[in-house]
Amino acid sequence: MAAALLGQIIPSPAIPSNVFFISPKYDYYQAHKHEYDTLFFGSSRVHNQIIPEVFDSTSRQAGIAVNSYNFGVPAMRAIDSTVLIKEVLKDPPKNLKWVFFETTLDKGYEPIFNARTYRSMYWHTWENTGFAARYILSSEVSAASKAALLVSHCLPALYRQMNVGRLFSQTLSSEFSAEEQAEAAVFTRNEGYAPLIDENSPYRQDFLQHQDEYKAAVAELTAIASTPMPNTAIAENKRMLLAEVTRVIRTAGAKPIFIEPPSLEPEQDFRAAWQQGEIETLLAYKDPERFPQLYRVDQRFDAGHLNGEAAQVFSQLLAQDFVK
């Protein structure tokens, strides 16, 4: 009870200062947002793969002057990505023109082990938890799956209401580690972008040891990409989320541009949504036949991400398609 009262007396900020990746980016953005007319939102496939400096210079060479910021955050999913873009664009840059958005339209799961982390608790207001519930309940998964998914959001919502993170800060550090501070310094210098360079990363080592599996996955994706898509409507929850993202961006006075990065995921939700008129503009790169340079082994950091060299190529391609 005392914890809940504390939250009423001293409400938590919309985006607190202790959520790694999100807080440093948000703080920098708030201080500099009116310098930018273009924003990128998404997961690590934005954070580690879109270089604002390269995108801006390529666009300028083609005759369109832009100044962009990379608001990508590793491990973002569909629901929290939507919550973040809504919060950031509540008070948009005065010259905002374009907003790029990337996500995977997943089932809406919030990992249980994240329930007592600042990153999960901060955004689980009752309003945002209600949005998550609508996304889950209007999905096509089974009733049992919906129940499990709902629980995954109710826990951090309850913890937030109880101010668990604030009362037990001894176990949830409110300061970034030296390693996190160093990483934040890198992406702050690079307008939000950070290359993947850790050769000792488990993901990197796994990729190096299983390249045959990667090549097989690329071949499978090539076959999927070359097959005509059936004219099947995307699920109601996915339409709802895309409509909300579109509404938020347009309300901020910008044009929404959706991105399908060069991943290995077989889902074609963004393409289906574009074909069915749910989204207006899509820049799609998940096709090894059309973009072999983005799927070569020597251009990947791991199976799911480009290395720094390929990120430059991808940023150039994105800008070239943007200015067309």
Regions found by a protein language model. Name each.
Residues I50, V54, D80-L84, L149-L150, ...:
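Extracytoplasmic/secreted proteins, especially bacterial periplasmic and envelope-associated proteins
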Residues N70-G72, E260, K286:
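Residue-level recognition of beta-strand->loop/alpha-helix junctions
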Residues Q268-K324:
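C-terminal regions of proteins
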Residues F41, R45-I136:
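Membrane-embedded segments
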Residues L242-P256:
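A structural motif corresponding to the C-terminal end of an alpha-helix
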Residues M1-V66, V83-L84:
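Membrane/wall-proximal cationic-aromatic binding patches
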Residues N48, P74-D80, A233-E236, E260-D269:
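Acidic-and-aromatic substrate-binding clefts and catalytic sites of carbohydrate-active enzymes
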Residues T117-M240, E244:
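Secreted/periplasmic serine-hydrolase-like ester/acetyl group-modifying domain
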